[in-house]
């Protein structure tokens, strides 16, 4: 695991960009892992080098993937 970005949702959950696993990882406010989103690749829902994160809405975040030079909007409930 290689964390490269972090943001906190309004309900206290954390979203971590994992550069090494090419995923986003969701944690509860206490640090317990809840789920992972994404996989290695260049298609929808896939990442090459996820890095910066920011909250867009209650369940949405913006992800900068420096490997694809792409910005994606991700729903943390549905991926």
Regions found by a protein language model. Give the residues of each.
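Eukaryotic scaffold repeat domains enriched in small/polar residues
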Residues: 1-79
